[in-house]
Amino acid sequence: MSTTRGVSSSSAAAALALLLLFALCFFSFHFAAAARAVPRDEHQENGGVKAVAAVAADQLVLQLEGDTGNGDEVSELMGAAEEEAAACEEGKNNDECVQRRLLSDAHLDYIYTQHKNKP
């Protein structure tokens, strides 16, 4: 009867050792993945090139300085904003205009209050 007790204790020890091995592997991979490099700031990656942001139709459109373009994209965005402003001044879709203005103001506040130097 002592042999059955010895076999069960050795299998329990083997199971415990296997469990510890799996736990060790899991945590080593977890910490290796968590130890990745911190991404650099946008200004450092772009070589100091600043981005000009414009909000149009509830979307953020970025145009980098030095991009090749004829300027029609910006004038189209400005024209769309002017048309929406004219429609709002006429009193059409007043609730929609107020909601659009609040959303664009909140979006601009978010853009300008981000902490660029902190990861």
Swiss-Prot record:
GO terms for molecular function: growth factor activity. This is Phytosulfokines 2. The keyword Chaperone does not apply. Sulfation is important for activity and for the binding to a putative membrane receptor. It comes from Oryza sativa subsp. japonica. Residues 1-34 form the signal peptide. Transmembrane segments: none annotated. One of its GO terms (biological process) is cell population proliferation.
